[in-house]
């Protein structure tokens, strides 16, 4: 006890003593009241305070027991039931260790309350426990979810070999999606076939509804004077243009795709680092970084070899027969062919 506390205690004792002495003085000529005061102070008051002390001790012990019981219940409930929340869309989700599903808040509340009722021990703290669990769930963001390996394999198998012809390509695509959700490397340009436009658009629409994130901002379908060092190439199978193929993936796996994508972006840091540090297919990596890494003169030479026809013609120049290579093409057409080549 500090000196200040000791002084305060002494003041309280003196104050109480003065009051008691005042009562004795007040009724010293009234034997009935005098005896009542004496009996109350000496006989009843100690019992009253002892009873108060015991009740308080019991209450504290009960609160400690309930607090411990509540903590154990909440921890057990959350460990056995993986609920997540997204504050942007105010959506709740449930993960059964295979698939993620959108979940109604009322259904979660019913699950919580029915679980408390079955245990019986927390009935007196039912409302308080419910509030604490819902608070913990709202703090459990979906972006921090770590999918099980069987979920990851399920997602990769849904994309490969249907849309991507290798698992590395599917993983790269997923990491790009995660980067876009977290707004990483937003200056990068990921060129993808126009055949994938509807697939990306629908995937993005559902992403906006579920988690409020745009997953398509770095995907481009045509070249428009983009900086070469920021360009990446994403190859997809031709069948991605078939609605009947990609619609099944969209309908059945979108939420799982988004969760695995966020996990990959966190795990590999970003899509470029996945290629450079974790992808074992050097040929694939070189294709992705082709525009970024190739020298511009070599790129132009390849463009000329692929798209430009050069005719050998004989012309007369100052009465001399000369063989020259003449290429005739308008600037507008040249730009069109260049974009077509890059696409």
Regions found by a protein language model. Give the residues of each.
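Short alpha-helical scaffolding segments that buttress acidic/His motifs in well-ordered protein cores
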Residues: 37, 258-261
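DNA transaction DNA-binding modules
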Residues: 88, 98, 214, 224-250, ...
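Intein modules and their embedded homing endonuclease domains
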Residues: 1-249, 253
